[in-house]
A protein has these predicted regions:
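Catalytic core of non-heme Fe(II) oxygenases with the double-stranded beta-helix
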Residues: 102-182, 187-201
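Non-heme Fe(II)/2-oxoglutarate
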Residues: 1-110, 130
Length: 201
């Protein structure tokens, strides 16, 4: 089972596109169910703005002030620390991007003493929401597709896209530019994103 859980495939085999795709193991999907449930409680609270994870995908605070996703919030660190997800992602990182390094050489980006905690957050998007072309901080980044309705993530510099099947995850070098077009369906779209650091650098 463990070997299968650590398998990823290239999004576009035989090309320079560095995006890798994997299916999320059922037990880890159950953990993510809990994360999303907590995120919904934050989103629906009168104090939601206090927990908002602000980045280019949420609000352009240095420009127009336009919100792209309707709401974003980080996952509570205690949920991440006790998860199989963290071990799984760090082992995937070492296997596919580690260049003979140990999984101990990688960690989830973290904001000590800040309400964001770890650099993993839930995105809630609805009709008209988008995510502008951007890249991420760190060495490696990923997107978890929780409830996506086939709304693709477009990887700009490689001219390819991933449809975002529910229950899958992509990982790619953090400098990879990507975006999501405005959502046309009148449905809730839920994804999670995260950033990994190489601690040996």
């Amino acid at each position: 089972m463990m070997d299968n859980a650590l398998e990823m495939i290239k999004l576009v085999p035989g090309t320079l596109c560095p995006v890798m795709v994997t299916k999320i193991p059922p037990q880890i999907l159950k953990e993510i169910d809990v994360w999303v449930s907590e995120s919904k409680k934050f989103k629906n609270s009168q104090l939601a703005g206090l927990k908002a994870h602000e980045n280019v995908g949420y609000q352009n605070t240095h420009g127009s002030g336009k919100k792209h996703n309707s709401y974003q919030c980080s996952i509570s660190p205690h949920l991440v620390d006790s998860s199989f997800w963290l071990a799984w992602v760090l082992r995937l990182t070492a296997k596919y991007w580690g260049m003979c390094k140990s999984n101990r050489d990688f960690k989830l980006r973290k904001w000590d003493g800040h309400f964001d905690g770890y650099d993993i957050w839930t995105n809630f998007a609805y009709k008209g929401d988008d995510n502008p072309t951007h890249n991420h901080a760190g060495m490696l980044s990923g997107v978890i597709y929780y409830k996506n309705h086939g709304h693709p993530t477009i990887f700009d510099q490689y001219g390819c896209a991933y449809e975002g099947l529910d229950g899958t995850m992509v990982m790619f070098p953090s400098g990879t530019y990507h975006h999501v077009e405005p959502q046309t369906a009148n449905k809730e779209r839920i994804t999670l994103a995260f950033n990994i650091l190489d601690t040996s650098l």
